[in-house]
Design a protein with these regions (language model features):
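Hydrophobic transmembrane alpha-helix bundles
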Residues: 85-88, 117-120, 259-261
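Acidic, serine/threonine- and glycine-rich low-complexity intrinsically disordered segments
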Residues: 90-201
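Acidic, serine/threonine-rich low-complexity disordered tracts
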Residues: 1-84, 153-265
């Protein structure tokens, strides 16, 4: 991993959500620049700049308004400097002061643009920003951060399989953390690159299932959470990755997202 070298990535997200009787297709385009800044206190330090976030398609007008507020809040992280451990988990945010300065402007916009709808959103974000651990827990699920660092520095013995357990956040706003068992496989490609494939399935945790049932108000619902992906590396440079998440919470809640990340030439 070459220090101070910047790589540019394009991410395309295509998906479908269903909340009660409302079903929506959506498409998002994202561009990011990522620079490795070196090893500091056993953490890999990265500077990440988001140069584009475009919500190209979202059918439901109510969900569009929610997406608009969410995207504006996430804009405070358009430039973020983070410390990652060897497992790809964010452990430190180095530019928290700059992020808080940006939040004050976003907070003013939310108050003027959506005075009623944004009240609880603002209160929740203010609480999160006062708690670094909670802030890190949430920002790790920003699309690019989550996908890029998902199997950061993970590898398997030649011809073997590695088993990983990760905690995933549900995609419906319930705030439930879902344990997922992941099966990681690796193979060498003819061009010298390495391909890593994984499959992940939800662990049947009774406490998690109970919380999801409370959220959906369905005492008999059997949740499903599945993930699949492919990562291609040239040495330690990520060339491309496919990332699919499927979540189903009973009859009325469904989400399927396909994320495609490519290195810009």
């Amino acid at each position: 991993m070459e220090k101070d070298k910047t790589f540019k990535y394009n991410t395309e997200i295509i998906g479908t959500t269903k909340v009660h009787s409302v079903k929506s297709d959506y498409k998002i385009r994202i561009k990011n620049e990522i620079t490795y800044k070196g090893l500091e206190d056993d953490l890999y330090r990265f500077n990440i700049v988001e140069s584009l976030y475009a919500l190209d398609d979202y059918e439901d007008p109510i969900m569009t308004q929610i997406a608009e507020m969410t995207n504006r809040i996430c804009s405070i992280y358009k430039e973020i400097e983070i410390g990652i451990n060897a497992e790809g988990i964010i452990e430190k945010v180095f530019n928290r002061d700059q992020i808080r300065d940006k939040w004050q402007k976003v907070k003013a916009w939310l108050t003027n643009a959506h005075p009623l709808e944004s009240y609880e959103v603002i209160r929740a974000k203010e609480f999160e920003l006062s708690n670094e651990e909670m802030e890190i827990k949430n920002i790790r699920f920003i699309h690019f951060l989550h996908q890029y660092f998902f199997i950061f520095r993970q590898s398997v013995d030649s011809g073997g399989t590695k088993y990983i357990k990760k905690n995933e956040m549900d995609r419906f706003g319930a705030g439930v953390v879902i344990p997922v068992n992941i099966n990681l496989r690796e193979k060498d490609l003819e061009n010298g690159a390495i391909e890593r494939n994984y499959e992940g399935k939800m662990v049947r945790d009774n406490k998690v299932i109970e919380r999801l049932r409370q959220f959906t108000k369905d005492n008999y619902m059997h949740p499903e959470y599945k993930m699949t992906g492919k990562y291609v590396y040239d040495n330690i440079t990520l060339l491309e990755s496919d990332f699919t998440i499927t979540e189903e919470l009973g009859e009325f809640y469904y989400n399927h997202s396909y994320l495609r990340l490519t290195l810009e030439e």
